């Protein structure tokens, strides 16, 4: 390689997605097992017929549909659309943080935070989790005069936990008003047990709060890449200044609009997944696993030094799960038969290894 590249790239990790091994059960990427609803599939087919045309760069129809879906308090000018919420995370770093500035997050958390911060030349401040959950008090204590952006991944990926809703409000109120807080809610549709935060109210009533959501998880459009942000109009304008033109295809926009129109059917699927989450969690705990209560479409198994053995043995059993170094394993809740296969393996594994 003779071209001169930025030296910062030398220490930059390459994002490694969940493996896809033909013939195996994939429980590694937090995807829904359901395909598009018929109405969404039809919208996709109609949009494919005009892929010779550029998409609407402003996503006018999608923003209008989102505003209607989110409620009367949300206006289209308070919404930004991106090619998945991860690109909006990148845009947030771009509009807030320069070289030497600090971007804070709990850790372990969403892996993409680190590279997008490092590429910007900013400094990632990783605040350790407390009981697998974002430690908001510790994050407050870690704020400095260089802090520009704070990510709160809620539910947290990969540990599946949420922060207490009241604690989140207190945290937002305590953070200096010139620091942007990004509440990353990729898995918000799976939150139950009275733990759903009023994040939209936070974003609409405070100019330094932005909420990120996606169509990749509960809506099942991971392959089309559509995410959105809700925040103050000035913040949304700033996001639009750094967006890649035509990043959200017309197919993706059409599918997202159709999904919003069918949100009742899609949320019924989510209820079914939550029931499976409860079933699988209970069975794993009964078998001897320790895991935090999940509010996402996946479970976190904090296996520590046993992580590698679990992952390798799972692969031998044709199960693909997501390891995180020597910390633990993230397991997606799949279809009932897939979950049964996981339970059979996991129960056999723990019985064998804890003799």
Swiss-Prot record:
One example GO MF annotation: histidinol-phosphate transaminase activity
SUPFAM superfamilies in the cross-refs: PLP-dependent transferases
A Pfam family the protein falls into: Aminotran_1_2
EC numbers: 2.6.1.57
GO biological process: L-histidine biosynthetic process
Keywords: Aminotransferase, Pyridoxal phosphate, Transferase
Source species, domain of life: Bacteria
Record keyword Iron present: no
Modified sites of kind N6-(pyridoxal phosphate)lysine: 217
Catalytic activity: an aromatic L-alpha-amino acid + 2-oxoglutarate = an aromatic oxo-acid + L-glutamate
Complex formation: Homodimer.
Family indicated by similarity: Belongs to the class-II pyridoxal-phosphate-dependent aminotransferase family.
PANTHER family for the chain: HISTIDINOL-PHOSPHATE AMINOTRANSFERASE, HISTIDINOL-PHOSPHATE AMINOTRANSFERASE 2
Function, as annotated: Aminotransferase that catalyzes the conversion of aromatic amino acids and 2-oxoglutarate into corresponding aromatic oxo acids and L-glutamate.
Full protein name: Aromatic amino acid aminotransferase
Originating species: Mycolicibacterium paratuberculosis (strain ATCC BAA-968 / K-10)
Gene: pat
């Amino acid at each position: 390689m003779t071209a001169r590249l930025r030296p910062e790239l030398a220490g930059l990790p390459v994002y490694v997605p969940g493996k896809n091994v033909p013939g195996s059960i994939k429980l590694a990427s937090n995807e829904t097992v359901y395909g598009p609803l018929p109405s969404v599939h039809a919208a996709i087919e109609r949009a494919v017929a005009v892929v010779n045309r550029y998409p609407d760069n402003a996503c006018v129809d999608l923003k209008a549909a989102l505003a209607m879906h989110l409620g009367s308090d949300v206006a289209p000018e308070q919404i930004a659309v991106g090619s998945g919420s991860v690109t909006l995370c990148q845009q947030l770093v771009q509009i807030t943080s320069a070289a030497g500035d600090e971007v804070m997050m709990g850790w372990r958390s969403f892996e993409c935070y680190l590279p997008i911060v490092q590429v910007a030349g900013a400094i990632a401040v990783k605040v350790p989790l407390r009981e697998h959950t974002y430690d908001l008090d510790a994050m407050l204590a870690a704020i400095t005069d260089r802090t520009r952006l704070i990510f709160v991944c809620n539910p947290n990926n990969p540990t599946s936990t949420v922060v207490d809703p009241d604690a989140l409000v207190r945290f937002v109120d305590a953070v200096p008003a010139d620091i942007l807080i990004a509440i990353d809610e990729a898995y918000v549709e799976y939150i139950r047990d009275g733990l759903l935060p009023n994040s939209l109210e936070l974003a609409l009533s405070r100019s330094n709060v932005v909420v990120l959501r996606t169509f990749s998880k509960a809506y099942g459009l991971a392959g089309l890449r559509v995410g959105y942000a809700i925040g103050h109009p000035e913040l949304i304008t700033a996001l639009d200044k750094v967006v890649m033109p035509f990043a959200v295809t017309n197919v993706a926009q059409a599918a997202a609009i159709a999904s919003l129109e069918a949100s009742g059917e899609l949320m019924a699927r989510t209820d079914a997944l939550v029931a499976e989450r409860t079933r699988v969690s209970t069975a794993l705990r009964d078998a001897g696993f320790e895991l935090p209560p999940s509010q996402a479409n996946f479970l976190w198994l904090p296996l520590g030094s046993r992580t590698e053995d679990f992952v390798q043995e799972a692969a031998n059993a044709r199960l693909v799960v997501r390891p995180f170094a020597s910390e633990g394993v993230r397991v997606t809740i799949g279809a009932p038969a897939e979950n049964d296969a996981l339970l059979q393996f996991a129960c056999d594994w723990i019985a064998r290894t804890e003799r």
